[in-house]
UniProtKB/Swiss-Prot annotation:
Signal peptide: none annotated. GO terms for cellular component: cytosolic large ribosomal subunit. One of its GO terms (molecular function) is rRNA binding. The keyword Ribonucleoprotein applies. Pfam families: Ribosomal_L1. This is Large ribosomal subunit protein uL1.
Length: 231
C-alpha cells in the first residue's frame, strides 16, 4: 500500500491543481505521467454552463475524431435482410433482429455501440431500460438510427464518439491513447471541443464552457485554459 501511495504521489508531482495550463503543455504532462503497463486512455472533461434537467439545456451529439480513438469498438446492428448484409460487410460485430433483442434482454451485451434501421426501432425500443443507462440506445440525432448502416458502422469503427451531458453539467469522452503523438491528441481534443460548442443548446445562458481538464486512465487531471481548446 505504501508503494502504491508513493507511486501516485510521484505521478502527481509537478501538476498544480490550481493552475490552468495551455493545451499543448497539458498534453505533454498527461503523456509523461501515463506510466501504467497498459496503453492508457486519454480523456477530456468539459464542465458546461447548462442544467440538463431542462430539455432546452441538453447537450448531446457525435463527433468523428480525426485520429480515431485507438480502441477496438465493437458494433451491434439491428437490421433485417439487405441492410443486415450491408452491416456485416461493413464490419459490424453483431447483426440481428428479434434474436439479437432476446440476447440483449438476457443480459448479454458484447458490444460498445448500437445502430438500428428506422423500421427496427419499435423492437429495439423494448431495450430502453437495458441500453439507455449505458448510453447505447440508438438515436437519429447522433446518426445511429439510419438506413445507411454501412456508413454508420464505418464511422463507429473509425473514431466516432458520442457525447451527452451528465447531471452535473459535465460532458466527457475518451479521445485517444497515451501512445498517440501530442499533435494527434491535440487535434482530437479540439475536434471534440468544437463539436460540444456547436451542440450548445438554445437554453444555455452565460459562460458555456466553464472548465476543461484532461487526464489519462491512471494519471491526475490537468486543468486547461478553455481558450486554448476552443480557439
Amino acid at each position: 500500500m505504501a508503494k502504491v501511495a508513493k507511486r501516485i504521489q510521484k505521478i502527481r508531482e509537478g501538476v498544480d491543481p490550481n493552475k490552468l495550463y495551455v493545451l499543448t503543455d497539458a498534453i505533454s504532462m498527461v503523456k509523461e505521467r501515463a506510466v501504467a503497463k497498459f496503453d492508457e486512455t486519454v480523456e477530456v472533461s468539459m464542465n458546461l454552463g447548462v442544467d440538463p434537467r431542462h430539455a432546452d439545456q441538453m447537450v448531446r451529439g457525435v463527433v468523428n475524431l480525426p485520429n480515431g480513438t485507438g480502441r477496438d469498438v465493437r458494433v451491434a446492428v439491428f437490421a433485417r435482410g439487405v441492410k443486415a448484409d450491408e452491416a456485416t460487410a461493413a464490419g459490424a460485430d453483431v447483426v440481428g433482429a428479434e434474436e439479437l433483442v432476446e440476447i440483449v434482454q438476457g443480459g448479454k451485451i458484447d458490444f460498445d455501440r448500437c445502430i438500428a434501421t428506422p423500421d427496427m426501432m419499435p423492437l429495439v425500443g423494448r431495450l430502453g431500460k437495458v441500453l439507455g443507462p449505458r448510453g447505447m440506445m440508438p438515436n437519429p440525432k447522433v446518426g445511429t438510427v439510419t438506413m445507411d448502416v454501412a456508413g454508420a458502422v464505418k464511422a463507429s469503427k473509425g473514431g466516432a464518439v458520442e457525447f451527452r451531458v451528465e447531471k452535473a453539467g459535465i460532458v466527457h469522452a475518451g479521445i485517444g491513447k497515451a501512445s498517440f503523438d501530442a499533435k494527434a491528441l491535440e487535434e482530437n481534443i479540439k475536434a471534440f471541443a468544437d463539436a460540444v460548442i456547436k451542440a450548445k443548446p438554445t437554453g444555455a445562458k452565460g459562460n458555456y464552457v466553464k472548465r476543461v481538464a484532461i487526464s489519462s486512465t491512471m494519471g491526475p487531471g490537468v486543468k486547461i485554459e478553455p481558450s486554448s481548446v476552443t480557439a
